[in-house]
């Protein structure tokens, strides 16, 4: 079963105006999680909504934006932090202080999702960034800097939950509802919902990789 089918009912139900008017905060998150698990229990069929709501994005890494220690594979589907700066052009699109890289395609409308495989390493984040995200100088991974993300960390206060530590590899799925202003993460069945004000700006996949981390888009 594809992630799109697994979330069809849950996301459609939660994002109707009638429900959004009534549900806020923890209630919103709780109901979303219950719907997700109910859908999984029924094989993703009993609660499935009409097809075509969520479009799968074939995401690749943009090497022109990659920090100097991040090496992008020839097929642009894998990126690894090799820990040693590489000789790369200091073009305007490139992050020069934070180990980050952007992906494509970008999104200006609609509902989309993409999947990323991660290993046993910590200190990584996956999400979305505005096209205008700062490339030069220190970067904080917060909405105020046009970044919406989650991931696994040893410790990073204020930017994500430092308690989410897993010892195994896995997959994270990122859902973006552009018009609804929602970014939704499924990380090992932990559902995180972030409200986002995209302000009409194109948003693109965003990745942060600490030392020795490798990520692969699926």
UniProtKB/Swiss-Prot annotation:
Nucleotidyltransferase keyword on record: no
SMART domains xrefs: PRY (SM00589), SPRY (SM00449)
Family: Belongs to the ohanin/vespryn family.
UniProt keyword Secreted, yes or no: yes
Biological source species: Lachesis muta muta (Bushmaster)
Signal peptide segment: 1-40
Keyword terms of this UniProt record: Neurotoxin, Secreted, Signal, Toxin
UniProt protein name: Ohanin-like protein
Residue ranges listed under propeptide: 41-48, 156-218
Protein function: Neurotoxin that produces dose-dependent hypolocomotion and hyperalgesia in mice. May directly act on the central nervous system, as it is 6500-fold more potent when administered intracerebroventricularly than intraperitoneal.
A Pfam family matched in the record: SPRY
Annotated GO MF terms: toxin activity
Location(s), subcellular: Secreted
Tissue: Expressed by the venom gland.
One of the record's GO cellular component terms: extracellular region
B30.2/SPRY domain segment(s): 49-155
Main location: secreted
């Amino acid at each position: 079963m594809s992630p799109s089918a697994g979330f069809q009912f849950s996301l459609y139900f939660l994002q109707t105006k009638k429900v959004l008017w009534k549900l806020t905060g923890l209630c919103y998150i709780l109901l979303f999680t219950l719907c997700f698990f109910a859908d999984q229990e029924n094989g993703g069929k009993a609660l499935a909504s009409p097809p075509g709501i969520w479009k799968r994005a074939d995401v690749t890494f943009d090497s022109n934006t990659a920090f100097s220690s991040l090496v992008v594979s020839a097929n642009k589907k894998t990126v690894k932090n090799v820990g040693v700066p590489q000789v790369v052009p200091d073009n305007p699109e490139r992050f020069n202080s934070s180990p980050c890289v952007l992906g494509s395609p970008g999104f200006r409308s609609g509902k989309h999702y993409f999947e990323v495989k991660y290993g046993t390493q910590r200190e990584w984040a996956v999400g979305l960034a505005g096209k205008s995200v700062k490339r030069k100088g220190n970067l904080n991974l917060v909405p105020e800097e046009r970044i919406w993300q989650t991931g696994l960390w040893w410790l990073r206060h204020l930017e994500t939950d430092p308690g989410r530590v897993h010892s195994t590899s896995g997959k994270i799925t990122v859902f973006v509802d552009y018009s609804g202003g929602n970014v939704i993460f499924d990380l090992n069945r932990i559902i995180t919902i972030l409200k986002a004000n995209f302000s009409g700006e194109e948003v693109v996949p965003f990745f942060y990789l600490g030392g020795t981390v490798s990520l692969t888009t699926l």
